[in-house]
Amino acid sequence: MAFSRFYLLTALYTGGILASSAYGIPSNYPEHHHRLIERLKKNSTQDSDSSPSESSPHPRQEPRRHVLTPVHNVLKDRPCDEGLSISKLLHSIEKETNSQISVDFTILPQWFYPKKAALATVDEKQPTWQFYISPNVSWQLYNSPTAGVGSIDFSYTLIRYWRNSAQNANNAAGIAGGINDYSSRTNTLSQLTFSQTFPGDILTVAMGQYSLYSIDGTLYDNDQQSGFISYALSQNASATYSLGSVGAYVQFTPTPSINIQAGFQDAYNIVGTSFDVYNLTKNKYNFYGYFSWAPQCKLGNGQYSALIYSTRKVPQQPTQTTGWSLNFGQHLGEKLYVFGRWNGATGTAINLNRSYVLGLASANPINRNSQDLLGAACSISKVNPKVVTEKRIRKYETVIETFATIGFGPHISLTPDLQIYIHPALRPDKRSAKVYGVRANFSA
């Protein structure tokens, strides 16, 4: 508790000295997908829905004549005056530190069939209960015509299971993919970077810990907390890059519709559990290149992107790989969004080495709540026979998933979800496997 209080006061103090009136994430590239940006944007939309009169920038309550003025202003807002309100407290901190903050907490029970593995005699416990917490922060340190924009971005993923794990459910259902994005207990520092955007908004240099998962995808097939849930539809199913590793990248944005990146990372930190700079001295690096085009047309905005990467052989992942991912997402009018992905990887790092995705989504289809969302998609994945070595397996596995997110106010939503696996790869004795789930999401 003492540490938390110290951290909060330090952030308020530093923000009061360095901050200006704009956020750390550029607002002039809205269609280039980034998981952190989407989460913060979603939180900002919810705040404007709940408090329309507060959607414009807030004037400071008191001129900053003292280093503790930001702390005084937060307390003056009385965020807990009518009971504990985390969203109001975070909103007050955002105003005074010139930052964007979001915290998403998801509870996901899932039921599955078949209930037991092929050679098992006892049914697996149902449902699996997944608890997913993800805090995200973008903090702009400075913004000036001569120095440009400097910001710190942070994202963390914490996964816990109760009663049973998704890994056991995967084994029982006989699927080579997964019933969700994280099949077991996880602690991942997805992002902790400092970025410098030079005047003109054309060149950005970033250094720190980051993951390619943040840019590899489109609006609804890249985040289990807000879009599709199954492994093959919530991320790149053949990805062999790190969940988070230290490195650096350069971003070139000649026009708002074009985004080009190239970078490197330490090859040793595969799961991103720590921020380890020492590994950079071991001289093994992963490299990537990324291109995104976000055109604007009469039908609606879209994004078309290509990612290519290579990873080195290290003890934590003892195979060298080369991978690629082609993505598209296109708005067709105000309510319909279509998307697709083709991705693959060489080597023996993962069960699936090819995946093909096609789907559609409709946000707020009846103008009831900004969180309302309907989605349906299909993924066909090719099983990697060098990794899945059982005698009897299927070469391909198909999952069809549909869900409906129902918003309750600005911060709570429920999402019934259905996944049907046609010809599960590891259960040739079964024609299909089914997974039912209800995602409860609480955001602040």
Swiss-Prot record:
Top-level taxon in the UniProt lineage: Bacteria
Organism taxonomic ancestry: Bacteria, Pseudomonadati, Chlamydiota, Chlamydiia, Chlamydiales
Job description of the protein: Facilitates L-arginine uptake, as part of the AaxABC system. The arginine uptake by the bacterium in the macrophage may be a virulence factor against the host innate immune response.
Gene3D superfamilies according to UniProt: Carbohydrate-selective porin OprB
Protein localization: Cell outer membrane
Signal peptide: 1-19
Region (Disordered): 42-68
Residue ranges, compositional bias (Low complexity): 46-56
Similarity remark: Belongs to the OprB family.
Disulphide bond pairs: none
Entry GO MF terms: porin activity
A cellular component annotation (GO) from this entry: pore complex
Gene behind the chain: aaxA
Keywords: Amino-acid transport, Cell outer membrane, Ion transport, Membrane, Porin, Signal, Transmembrane, Transmembrane beta strand, Transport, Virulence
Protein's name in the database: Porin AaxA
